[in-house]
UniProtKB/Swiss-Prot annotation:
Keyword Nucleus: no
Annotated organism of origin: Centruroides exilicauda
PROSITE patterns to which the protein is assigned, alphabetical: LCN_CSAB
Keyword Disulfide bond: yes
Cited InterPro entries: LCN-type_CS_alpha_beta_dom (IPR044062), Scorpion_toxin-like (IPR003614), Scorpion_toxin-like_sf (IPR036574), Scorpion_toxinL (IPR018218), Scorpion_toxinL/defensin (IPR002061)
GO MF: sodium channel inhibitor activity; toxin activity
Gene3D superfamilies in the cross-refs: Knottin, scorpion toxin-like
SMART domains: Knot1
Subcellular location: Secreted
Protein name: Neurotoxin Cex11
One BP annotation, GO: defense response
Length: 66
C-alpha cells in the first residue's frame, strides 16, 4: 500500500517542509519497513508501505483532537 505513516500516540502524520525527495521522510518510511518515502503535501508519504502498519488517518486517535 501507499500512504502517510502515522504517529500512533498523536494520530498525526509526520510533517515535513522540504517537498519531494527528503532524507527525513526516507528515514521515517524505512523505519516502518516501507520501500521509499518523500515529502508530499507537507507530510511524509511512503510507498511499499507494509499492510500491518497504521496509516493516516488513524481511526483510534484524531490528530490534534481529544
Amino acid at each position: 500500500k501507499e500512504g502517510y505513516p502515522v504517529n500512533i500516540y498523536t494520530g498525526c502524520k509526520y510533517s515535513c517542509w522540504l517537498l519531494g525527495e527528503n532524507e527525513y521522510c526516507i528515514a521515517e518510511c524505512k523505519e516502518i519497513g516501507a520501500g521509499y518515502g518523500y515529502c508530499h503535501g507537507f507530510g511524509c508519504w511512503c510507498e511499499q508501505f507494509p499492510e500491518n502498519k497504521p496509516s493516516y488517518p488513524y481511526p483510534e486517535k484524531s490528530c490534534g483532537r481529544k
